């Protein structure tokens, strides 16, 4: 019995070490040739220009994309907390990739596959920043590995506040709108500072972003 246990322990240890080796090998292989994440420091998005009449009505809007940049200090906590709750509950605890979130999503997706439900993602907000700014939307393991590597690097170089600012100004929220400031005008015809909890529930639900 003891001999069998020792043999099993050796197999498990060998498998664990092999897995660690493969992970480090993949990170080393995909680390070369990645986009320069440092350019995020000088991010200047193309924003919309709006023309209003004397009575305050919108006359015209000129833009390639519906987008209004707003500093993180001007985004109310109710908006920030709604996105954190919906997208990345462990944002302030993880280093770019959330191991607990990945494990939880894997278990949940096994249930979803059995029940024929929609699969859940496990990308952190930092990973989404890496994808939206530096990578493509290609669905592949290669892209996910690059996304994870960039997420680690972004977390080392930028504050959580800056990462949130980038995310909340870049996220696509449907109807051609990018960022929370532009979407608040599109959906509610009011400033992002005027949004309440019920507004944010619509903001963070999948439906406004179905057209991604």
What are these regions (language model features)?
Residues 71-125, 178-183, 188, 193-195:
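Flexible, acidic/glycine-enriched loop-and-adjacent beta/alpha segments
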């Amino acid at each position: 019995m003891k001999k069998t246990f020792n043999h099993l322990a050796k197999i498990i240890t060998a498998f664990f070490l092999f897995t660690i080796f493969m992970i480090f090998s993949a990170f080393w292989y995909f680390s070369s040739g990645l986009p320069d994440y440092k350019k995020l420091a000088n991010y200047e998005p193309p924003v919309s220009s709006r023309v209003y009449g004397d009575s305050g009505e919108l006359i015209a809007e000129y833009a390639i994309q519906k987008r209004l940049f707003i500093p993180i200090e001007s985004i109310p906590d109710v908006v920030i907390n709604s996105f954190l709750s919906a997208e990345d509950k462990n944002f302030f605890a993880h280093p770019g990739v959330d191991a607990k979130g990945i494990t939880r999503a894997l278990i949940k997706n096994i249930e979803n596959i059995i029940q024929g439900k929609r699969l859940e993602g496990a990308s952190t907000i930092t990973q989404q920043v890496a994808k939206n700014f530096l990578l493509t939307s290609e669905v592949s393991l290669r892209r996910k590995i690059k996304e994870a590597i960039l997420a680690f690097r972004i977390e080392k170089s930028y504050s959580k506040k800056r990462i949130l600012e980038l995310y909340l100004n870049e996220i696509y929220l449907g109807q051609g709108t990018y960022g929370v400031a532009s979407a608040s005008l599109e959906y509610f015809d009011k400033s992002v500072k005027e949004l309440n909890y019920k507004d944010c529930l619509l903001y963070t639900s999948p439906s406004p972003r179905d057209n991604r």
